[in-house]
Design a protein with these regions (language model features):
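Non-cleavable N-terminal signal-anchor transmembrane helices
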Residues: 52-150, 154, 355
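Surface-exposed loop/turn elements that mediate protein-protein interactions on large endomembrane-trafficking
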Residues: 69-82, 110-136, 158-177, 208-216, ...
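Short loop/turn segments immediately following the C-termini of beta-strands
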Residues: 154, 198-200, 277-279, 323, ...
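N-terminal export/targeting signals for secretion/compartment entry
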Residues: 1-76
Length: 409
């Protein structure tokens, strides 16, 4: 029997063993999570790698279809870096985390005294492994496994949530809602979404009475800091499309809003609560699924919404605040239960955990402009960083500065 016959027999066996694909999106996400857990079985994988590699683009003989593989699956390298690219053009990843996309901000005038802050997204094309501009969406959240993203259309608040196929670029299906939604966020298992509802577009701006950016002209637009139009949140079962809305009380202190005009909800670490930031202490507020305020979970008591990385995968460590000096950068790693500093790592701002010892952060080169940050990989117990992207250009708020969107691959 020659090599071609061996491959064909192998494909027939694989096709016969595979159960029919169901329509459930959640099943696909869970499959992606199982693939990540099984990555450690390296010996068995190495023994079969040659056959799998040959079989990738070969049609399944019984079905006439091609096996689908994502760009994030084709390159399973621990670190995929492009330190010469800013904004990124090609896939960036470390460990189980990848840069799923990024967005830039722009201010679009709607009248003499009003404007709206808009986002322009570049999303990873899972067919080519490149970041491609997609102007259709105002908000994006990428599911674990990076096959699907939840999206909102440009006009906010939106009355439907789209599930975008990141391989084809097409909408898989729409989930309609009765109340306007302006943000979406996946749970860590990809089975649910929390969608924040607003009565008005939270990205609307008004003309400032002073010269905010110091350029000598009074042409700046700012959010309405004293007002919040947030009304509550939907819990969305992704597989069935069922939704449940809960109202949340206004967050005010002496009749002034203590949340930003856009202050979106996300899930707690274990997915049993939802949370959002506050502009004042205690900096985070948690809610049960009925919209009632509850105490912070014990292992999230010392977290703050301004530090994006939050808990390590095993829950034993938490990302802390900036801990650098006048000429050095650094950030804390703390005990999530006590708030005590356990470690100090490089980095201006900790963005996401890669594993239990490594994180992706914004950081600058020694002596560089504080706004010229690049994505870097930092490791607990090491002063060495590995640059993953090129550096941002311009100062804070300058056109073209990009903001990363991460997801597990």
């Amino acid at each position: 029997m020659n090599v071609g016959e061996l491959v064909r027999d192998s494909l027939r066996e694989q096709a016969a063993e595979q159960p029919p694909l169901g329509p459930g999106f959640a099943d696909r996400v869970l499959t992606a999570r199982r693939r990540r857990r099984n990555r450690s079985i390296a010996t068995v994988a190495a023994a079969t790698a040659a056959v799998v590699a040959v079989a990738v683009a070969v049609p399944l003989l019984d079905s006439g279809k091609h096996e689908v593989r994502l760009a994030t699956e084709m390159n399973r390298s621990d670190i995929i870096a492009h330190p010469d690219q800013s904004p990124p053009r090609d896939l960036i990843a470390a460990g189980d985390v990848a840069l799923a996309g990024y967005y830039t901000l722009d201010t679009v005038k709607t009248s003499k005294d009003t404007a709206v802050r808009t986002r322009a997204y570049h999303i990873l094309d899972q067919e080519t492994g490149k970041y491609v501009k997609d102007t259709r969406w105002s908000q994006i959240s990428v599911a674990p496994g990076m096959r699907t993203a939840a999206v909102l259309e440009k006009d906010l608040p939106a009355r439907r949530i789209g599930l975008l196929d990141l391989l084809t670029g097409d909408i898989e299906r729409w989930i309609s809602v009765d109340r306007g939604v302006a943000a979406v966020s996946f749970s860590s298992d990809g089975a649910r979404l929390v969608a924040t509802t607003y009565s008005k577009n939270p990205d609307e701006l008004t003309k400032a009475s002073n010269d905010v950016d110091g350029d000598g002209t009074k042409n700046d637009f700012v959010p309405q800091f004293s007002e919040s139009y947030r009304t509550g949140f939907y819990l969305v079962d992704v597989d069935s499309g069922r939704t449940k809305w809960s109202e949340t009380p206004p967050e005010k202190d002496d009749e002034l809003a203590i949340v930003n005009s856009r202050q979106d909800f996300s899930f707690s670490g274990d997915g049993t609560l939802v949370r959002s930031g506050l502009a004042v202490e205690p900096h985070d507020q948690y809610y049960d699924f009925q919209g009632n305020k509850v105490a912070k979970p014990a292992n999230e008591k010392y977290l703050t919404w301004s530090v994006q990385a939050r808990l390590s995968p095993d829950g034993k460590l938490a990302a802390g605040r900036f801990a650098g000096g006048a000429r050095t950068t650094g950030s804390e790693i703390i005990d999530p239960y006590t708030g005590k500093r356990l470690h100090k790592v490089r980095g201006q701002q900790l963005l996401t955990w890669v594993d239990n010892e490594r994180l992706i952060a914004w950081d600058i080169k020694p002596g560089d402009n504080e706004f010229h940050s690049a994505l870097v990989l930092v490791t607990i117990g090491s002063d060495t960083t590995l640059r993953l992207s090129g550096a941002l250009k311009g100062n804070d708020g300058a056109p073209g500065r990009w903001n990363p969107v991460f997801a597990t691959r």
